[in-house]
Amino acid sequence: MATRSVSMKQTSQRAASPNKTQGAKKWSAVAARGSKIAQSATNDHRNVESIKVVPENRVRGGVAAKATDSSSNVTSLASSEENVSSVSGSAKSNNSQQRVWKTDVAISAEKRTETRQRELRRWMPDPEDAGVPLAGLEESTDNVEWDQFATNEKLFGVKSHFDEDLYTSRIDRSHPKYKEKEQEADRIAKEIEGTVTNNIHIAEERGLKVDDSGLDEEDLYSGVHRSIDVVRNYTRSNAYNKNNKDQKPKNHEAPHQHPQQKVVPPDDPAIVSHRHLALPRAPGPDSRAAERFFNARRKAGPLSRREKEGQIKEFMQFSQSLKIGSLDSKQPSSTKSVAEVKVADEKQLPDASSQATPADSKEPRKEEAEKPVTSATEVSSEKVEKVDGNTSSPSKEEEKPSTEPEKPSVVTQRKETTGTKLGTKLNAKAISFKPNVAAPVFTPGKFTIPSKPAPVNASRPMMPQQSNNSEASIPSTTPQSPSVVSNGENKPSSSPVFFNGPVSSEKEPILDNFNVFKNVGEEHQGAEQIDKPFSCPPTWNTGPNSLQQTIANSRPEGNSGSAKKAAAANPMIPSIVLPNSAMPSAMPMYPTPTMPYIPVGYPVPGYTPYMRNPSQHTSVAPSPNGTPTSGNSSTVGSPMIGYMAPQFIPPYAMPQFPPSGNGRGASAPATYFVPQMGGMMAYTMNGVPPMYGQYAPNNGMMNMHYPMYGDSRRSNSQRSFNSSNGKRSNVHKNNNASNTFSHSNASTSSSLNAAPNTTAKSSSQTAPPVSKGDATEKTEKDASANQEAKP
């Protein structure tokens, strides 16, 4: 049995050997904490392995006990392995948590979850505490005032430096008007407290009883404005409802009942002084003031009506007494009233005329009062002329008999009084408006004649042909002035006076002349207006007068014709324009019939002509401006094909072509130059440069180039273009004589002359006609000779 048990122990230990190996691997990864545990586990493993080699004969008497001890060691080893694994796992988890990378959103989310507040719950009193009143400072029975600063200093030792004057206005009680200001403040406070409020908190501060059943702290003391209907349902006070004290709110079926609190108002001086007063049940001072106001209006109503009626009657009487006439001249409605006034005026006019002296002290004042009369007559004269308009002819005026001989004086006096009335405001009770029959008539020296036409009856002078014989026989007691002349007839005025005539609708307000918007609008309407872009159709109207046609048909203005005529009459001698210089302003751009033409590129003394490199003809047509293109491949400056060559004009009846030295006939024209080597100047046959004006006008020009300035000094048409690869090439070389004469013109190849130099022949000899090859060899020889002859 013992042997069998030992073998079983061995098999169990062998089965557990893989776990030991895994535990050993884990221990190697653990730091200082698992080192001791690993050592103990290794020792136990050695003990277990030693049991395997124990002989069978020795497994007696305590071997089983040893095996039992070893098995217990194995069990402890397994438990230690679990502990080590747990320790290593926790260490790894801590390291992984520390090494996790988090974003700001994740960190803020964790902070929100950590600092998240708990859900607020509504406080509900316990059932057993429902009848207990809430304690407050107002319920203290002692009369000792509570001082928060003294309490803090007593309990916490904090001494306050609070100064009330820093936060409120300081009251100066020693001011002499302090009592008056206090009474005024008390009155304002009572007025404020007498107003009706829907705020429960304000009502509570005023000492009113508030039924707070069904209301919480938010409803009572919150600053949120609730609807008026909701607040009224919970508000109970003496000012709002007196008969419904026991009425409960309908919105709450079983409100939580609290005992009524004893409300004590704060110790404010404005409230303490009138604490014994209740809310005003009767209408306040506002209602009394309103009653007094309405009573005053009722009493003032009849008085105002009487005053208005009296004023209207006075104006009516005044207008009737001053009535001049209606619009219809056939109905003299005011004849009697005018006659009565006339009789009274005749009695006092002699006295008034005798009293009128230049030294009268009242006269300056009357002149000042008469000044607005002139302006009134000037304004009314224009309207009278428009309405009246010479309705009655002179013949009708002659037919009417003059029944009242004294009408001229009456009309003049009445017009004077009317002018004074119209010049000022209409006030019936004013003394200045009453007719003053004693007023003297102003003399012509003291009365200014108005520049504008005056009314017909008073200020219009009578023409000689309109005067009647009866007028001459009427004696006049008053001196008539030029501006006040009567025609012997009571001609009714068409100007409306007060209530007799219709109000003229032609009167324009004076303020409109000073209206900025009106004036600017009139100027804008009178100015030429251009249609807005959005008001134009998408297609423009085209025609001979349209803007597009006008611009297209326009020509630049200038006296170009006179300039042409002046240039033709006085032709100027053309001068040579050096490179990199401006063209003379007086020189015309094109030759006139009387002006010889000098082609561009005329040889300048000191410079050699630039010869073109031979190139093939291009397909480009000749330039319309007369400038040949680069297709002209010539060894000399010959014109293009199709253009007239420049002809040499001999001066003063000399032969056109000088005789040649060899007697073979005329040589090449002197205008064709033979290229010279070594920078020598090419001249004519006799070695003298041609004179100015020896070129006949032609349609083209010679292609002469300036080698010292390079290709940049040439025009675009003179630059060669290689048609093979499409790129410009600067292959113009002065010393490449073989290329220069390889493609020479047929007209000049037969008559080329050698250039004069120190080693060549004399200029009088002429070279015989040679072929292209001979010419090339000869040119190369001349070039080498020229180079040797250079200093």
Curated annotation (Swiss-Prot):
Residues 76-96, 473-486, 715-725, 734-760 have a biased composition (Low complexity). Residues 1-22, 326-337, 487-497 have a biased composition (Polar residues). The keyword Cell membrane does not apply. Disruption phenotype: Impaired RNAi-mediated heterochromatin silencing. InterPro entries: ATXN2-like (IPR045117), LsmAD_domain (IPR009604). It comes from the Eukaryota. Coiled coil: none annotated. It is found in: Cytoplasm. The keyword Cytoplasm applies. Interacts with mkt1. Belongs to the ataxin-2 family. Involved in post-transcriptional regulation of gene expression, probably by association with mkt1. This is Ataxin-2 homolog. It comes from Schizosaccharomyces pombe (strain 972 / ATCC 24843) (Fission yeast). The gene is ath1.
